[in-house]
A protein has these predicted regions:
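Active-site-proximal substrate-binding groove within the catalytic cores of carbohydrate-active enzymes
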Residues: 1-125
């Protein structure tokens, strides 16, 4: 499926490259935080592009600093637990790729539902 991320870079290099992810909720249909969770990445709290509406800096849904900080806290907590672990599995759980799951070597998993814009984190050993 086009929606299903099959990011071999994240699978192969997850435990040796820190790749920060934007925390923007671009629209009611796309939330970058979900991608950060799937990859076990680190968050950007505030990321301004060099030019407005370019370089990944788009005016999407406005999120308060308080909410952005809470979103970053969730991603940071996961990253702290998984940064040095292998990202051992990524799968699409639905045919259209709207629900995806990542699993780390200690059993920690993340399920993201892109249609409903929700996630579940289960921490391993």
């Amino acid at each position: 499926s086009e929606m299903c991320i099959r990011d071999s870079f994240s699978l192969v290099y997850h435990d040796c490259v820190i790749e920060p992810w934007m925390m923007d909720r671009v629209s009611k249909d796309e939330d970058y935080m979900l991608y950060a969770l799937l990859a076990g990445g680190a968050p950007y709290l505030v990321r301004d592009g060099a030019y407005p509406n370019t370089d990944g800096a788009f005016d999407g849904e406005k999120i308060s600093l308080e909410e952005m900080t809470e979103r970053c806290r969730v991603v940071t907590e996961l990253h702290e637990k998984t940064a040095l672990l292998e990202l051992v599995r990524h799968e699409c759980m639905t045919a259209d790729g709207s629900v995806q799951k990542s699993e780390f070597s200690d059993g920690t998993y993340v399920i993201c539902d892109f249609a409903e814009q929700i996630y579940e984190i289960g921490y391993g050993a």
